[in-house]
């Protein structure tokens, strides 16, 4: 039986950003306020001063970037908060896309000096596709930043969404004095501190107390700007926000712990509790009494001391109970889970029960694939985001004949995670890895060596696109595969994939074989 109070208090969201906008720093500070950590690890200039809690994989600690989604949960006031800290690096966009299928809201971090960047636009497009509610945190206001009104204009123009500031900065850089909380009508004066929680000051902006706090000149400027905000921007409307049409905006400095508590306090109040999830068969409501959930991520070796996988399951409805029987829909088998876990980055604890909105980890020995569904018996298939055609391709070869088994296992597990895509060329039988960018090849090589004791080498392969093909005309499909036999491959699901080596070749193939459909995503 679903407990509506438990479901209502859940807040499950992702933090997304362009690389180096301060996303992991913000995650750390939210955990600090949530009481999960005592010291936040500063990620600065790609060097780790103290190890960031949410960057738990060795390669992340070395490089100072996030390369995989971390899942963390904590209680804050009367709410249960689940944070998914996603990779900011552009090469790991697919991991972020999949994560967005498992959240009910998103916080976008924007660098105050740089404004909206490429990756932010792409991620916002995915949020728009799913009507995901968005909150924007403009970070690094303690450094020289763009004019806040210019930033708001840029957000509206670039992200195609209406905005409403709920806090407002008093200057930036060396002149930065703090932020005024429009939502709660109080002043938060800036004290650079990576650990100390700054106190709020209740102040009426129309009295001399404001002048005494920040000086008459800045006080007059702040009053004028707040008046302009009320005249130009719409009042905050929670319904518009929940529909993904209005984004509240906050200003601060995550690294120096400033403006973060205002963001968190407002977020838990206005952010959505678990939302309905669409399955191919029907829409699933979170309050339904029966448990349903889907696997959105698989991580190998979350604990390097044990060669195990964890499948991350987003609970869509009802209540999950440890050791209860659940149907694995794709296999048609009943499974029980004796050690389901929840996370604080790499620290995990066994849970006896979890509710709609929660993310739980299930031990996986190869049973799960991304997109798998678990239910109490009903056959459901949740709709997710597909894999996209990779941008780069390389042959992967074994560099140590004695470690063939380890290499095969490592490739299988990493592909299950969705780090990259694997194709097998039907002409020569060689394995091809397809990725979004170069860094993924480095991560795969590093992890194969450090987690599986297997060595690989890469051989460049010049390809334009991987296209999944299908046709109602079996004869034409067979004729195409015969003509293009050198460029035909199979993906891990056994589907036919055409590896086009140029845009011209693809265009000619589409013209010559009009009854064949060429798809650039794996779901069609």
Model feature map: region roles:
Residues 1-524:
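Structural and coupling elements of P-loop NTPases
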């Amino acid at each position: 039986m679903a407990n509506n109070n438990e479901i209502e208090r859940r807040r499950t969201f992702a933090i997304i950003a362009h690389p180096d906008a301060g996303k992991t720093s913000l995650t750390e500070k939210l955990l600090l306020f949530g009481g999960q950590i005592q010291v936040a690890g500063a990620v600065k200039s790609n060097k780790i001063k103290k190890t960031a809690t949410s960057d738990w994989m060795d390669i992340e600690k070395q490089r100072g970037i996030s390369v995989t989604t971390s899942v963390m949960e904590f209680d804050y006031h009367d709410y249960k908060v689940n944070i998914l800290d996603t990779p900011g690096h552009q090469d790991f966009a697919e991991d972020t896309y999949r994560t967005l299928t498992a959240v009910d809201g998103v916080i976008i971090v924007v660098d105050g000096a740089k404004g909206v960047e490429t990756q932010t636009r792409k991620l916002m497009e995915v949020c728009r596709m799913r009507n995901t509610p968005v909150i924007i945190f403009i970070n690094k206001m303690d450094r020289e930043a763009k004019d806040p009104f210019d930033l708001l204009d840029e957000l509206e123009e670039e992200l195609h969404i209406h905005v409403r500031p709920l806090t407002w900065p008093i200057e930036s850089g060396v002149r930065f004095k703090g932020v005024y909380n429009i939502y709660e009508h109080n002043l938060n004066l800036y004290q650079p501190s990576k650990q100390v929680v700054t106190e709020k000051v209740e102040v009426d902006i129309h009295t001399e107390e404001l002048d005494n706090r920040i000086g008459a000149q800045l006080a007059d400027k702040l009053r004028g700007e707040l008046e302009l905000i009320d005249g130009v921007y719409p009042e905050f409307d929670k319904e518009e926000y929940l529909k993904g049409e209005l984004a509240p905006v906050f200003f601060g400095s995550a690294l120096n712990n400033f403006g973060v508590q205002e963001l968190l306090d407002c977020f838990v109040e206005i952010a959505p509790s678990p939302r309905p999830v669409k399955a191919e068969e029907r829409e699933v409501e979170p309050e339904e009494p029966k448990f349903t959930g889907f696997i959105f991520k698989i991580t190998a070796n979350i604990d390097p001391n044990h060669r195990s996988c964890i499948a991350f399951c987003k609970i869509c409805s009802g209540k999950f109970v440890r050791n209860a029987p659940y149907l694995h829909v794709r296999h048609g088998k009943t499974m029980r889970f004796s050690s389901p876990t929840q996370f604080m980055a790499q620290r995990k604890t066994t849970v006896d029960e979890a509710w709609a909105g929660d993310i739980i980890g299930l031990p996986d020995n190869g049973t799960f694939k991304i997109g798998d569904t678990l239910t109490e018996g009903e056959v459901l298939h949740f709709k997710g985001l597909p894999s996209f055609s990779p941008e780069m391709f390389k042959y992967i070869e074994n560099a140590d004949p004695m470690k063939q088994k380890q290499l095969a296992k490592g490739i299988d597990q990493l592909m299950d995670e969705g780090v990259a895509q694997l194709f097998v060329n039907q002409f020569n039988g060689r394995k091809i890895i397809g990725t979004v960018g170069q860094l993924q090849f480095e991560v795969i090589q590093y992890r194969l060596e450090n987690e599986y004791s297997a060595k690989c080498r890469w051989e460049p392969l010049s390809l334009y696109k991987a296209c999944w093909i299908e046709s109602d005309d079996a004869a034409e499909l067979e004729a195409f595969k015969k003509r293009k036999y050198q460029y035909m491959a199979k993906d891990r699901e056994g589907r036919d994939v055409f590896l086009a080596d140029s845009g011209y070749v693809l265009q000619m193939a589409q013209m010559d074989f009009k009854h064949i459909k060429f798809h650039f995503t794996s779901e069609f």
